């Protein structure tokens, strides 16, 4: 990045409902070289970084879009988006500390957009008694239910019973409706993780409906998988490491479903190309 903080983190990718456009959004944050997480939350960016593409190969220039200035945010972390078919808008959500409580607690806010240029005023999406960050949402069409997964960033167990640095679950029929908690002993047992992202396996990759929740062991190996055949149960199992292969130190990001044609185009353009100083870049 050559804009503002000069580095981006937590990339999130979404396909338009028409299927012909992709949007990528990310956190505007440089922490490498100073490691001052306090300042990053009090005096950080109030903007999202946005890119657009029609093919996953050719991308627009990056643009910085201010979304959290009106709440006097000290940061705008880990943005993600979910398309709302009820309103025809994207619901974009991120975590911010604000001056309202002297930058004391991370709260997840949301704003609506149709084009990733203009956004509505932010409103609260998730507020608990402890800090909450890194929300991700998935829709289960068989239940007609949304599930959202969020990190308890606080130093104590929150009111939903989620231990510090673990992931808690909520569900709702609508994106902006009432969300109710889903208990999970298994996620409570997986502490010191963040950046959850979840996807459903293709039908030919699993005999039954199966979902994979990736969680980022931020102090160690990075992403590892947790599996379930029943989102409503809230329970996940961690497969033996011998059953899968994860990229080295894969971190906070997004898997999406693509076509064979799209895959071939991406591989033709990028292949196995890694940036120079790739190991250093991973540590940033």
Tell where the protein language model's regions lie, with residue ranges.
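Trp- and S/T/G-rich repeat-edge/linker motifs of beta-rich repeat architectures
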Residues: 58-64, 118-125, 180-182, 235-245
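Conserved blade-ending motifs and adjacent loop-strand segments that build the rim/top face
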Residues: 187-197, 234-252
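Short, small-residue-biased leader/transition segments that mark boundaries at the very start
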Residues: 3-4
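Beta-propeller blade signature
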Residues: 47-55, 107-114, 168-172, 225-230
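C-terminal closing repeat unit and adjoining cap/tail of repeat-based domains
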Residues: 212-216, 221-240
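Repetitive beta-architecture junctions, highlighting loop-to-beta-strand starts
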Residues: 46-48, 105-108, 164-167, 209, ...
């Amino acid at each position: 990045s050559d804009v503002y903080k000069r580095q981006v983190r937590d990339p999130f990718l979404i396909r338009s409902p028409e299927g012909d456009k992709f949007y990528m959004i990310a956190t505007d944050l440089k922490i490498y070289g100073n490691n001052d997480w306090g300042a990053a939350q009090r005096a950080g960016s109030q903007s999202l970084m946005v890119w657009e593409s029609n093919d996953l190969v050719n991308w627009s220039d990056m643009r910085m879009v201010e979304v959290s200035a009106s709440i006097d945010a000290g940061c705008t972390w880990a943005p993600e988006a979910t398309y709302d078919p009820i309103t025809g808008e994207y619901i974009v959500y991120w975590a911010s500390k604000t001056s309202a409580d002297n930058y004391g607690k991370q709260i997840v806010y949301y704003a609506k957009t149709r084009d990733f240029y203009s956004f509505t005023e932010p409103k609260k999406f998730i507020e608990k008694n402890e800090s909450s960050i890194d929300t991700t949402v998935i829709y289960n069409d068989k239940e007609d239910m949304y599930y959202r997964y969020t990190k308890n960033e606080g130093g104590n167990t929150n009111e939903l019973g989620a231990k510090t640095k673990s992931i808690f679950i909520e569900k709702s029929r609508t994106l902006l409706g009432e969300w109710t908690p889903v208990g999970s002993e298994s996620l409570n047992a997986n502490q010191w993780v963040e950046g959850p992202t979840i996807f459903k396996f293709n039908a030919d990759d699993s005999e039954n409906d199966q979902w994979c929740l990736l969680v980022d062991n931020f102090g160690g190996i990075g992403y590892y998988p947790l599996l379930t055949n029943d989102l409503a149960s809230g329970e996940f199992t961690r497969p033996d490491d011998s059953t899968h292969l994860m990229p080295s130190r894969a971190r906070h990001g997004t898997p999406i479903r693509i076509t064979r044609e799209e895959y071939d185009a991406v591989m033709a353009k990028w292949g196995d190309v890694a940036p120079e100083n790739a190991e250093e870049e991973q540590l940033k």
